[in-house]
């Protein structure tokens, strides 16, 4: 049967991954202004996230602006936003399904094989959600690298990785590890017990004896 400790560990990792995905999606520090070349002015630090852009001054003041129109955003940012939202929703759904199939819960009936299969289904959903977040983070990362090394990009508009993208990466890997543990915890099922075949007496094919005993 499914190992209880493996299920608990997988569920915990996926839950931590969900927290990381939510924090990473909300934070505006997906990319930050890079101070390269002649761009050494550090009085203002620019950050851009999936939902807003912020400017931090050396005095401690902060100004953030939410993106007004979706149509003004580039395709990479729109795809990253959509994939991260889908990843969070799938992770929440996967945790709900997996919790019903875990051995330490009373949901999903008393059939242990059925419960382990439910836990496996939840693990698969979690893995799909993690893959969505990995694709989103990878896409955004490649966009930052491509713009940074593009010779036609002005120096004052070059960006490097922010803290949010690392948190999102960590959440994605925790999610996929937890989903893999839950998916691999399914048992193969119980085979029907093999009862010994009942041995029937072999009937004799000889005709009954016609001899009679005489006194």
UniProtKB/Swiss-Prot annotation:
Q: Where is this region: Disordered?
A: 186-215
Where are the compositionally biased (Polar residues) regions?
Answer: 186-195
Q: Which residues cross the membrane?
A: 8-28, 82-102, 118-138, 163-183
Keywords from the named record: Cell junction, Cell membrane, Membrane, Tight junction, Transmembrane, Transmembrane helix
All ranges on the Extracellular side of the membrane = 29-81, 139-162
Q: Name one GO molecular function term.
A: structural molecule activity
Record's compositionally biased regions (Low complexity): 196-215
Function of the protein? Plays a major role in tight junction-specific obliteration of the intercellular space.
Q: What is this protein called?
A: Claudin-7-B
Species name for this entry?
Danio rerio
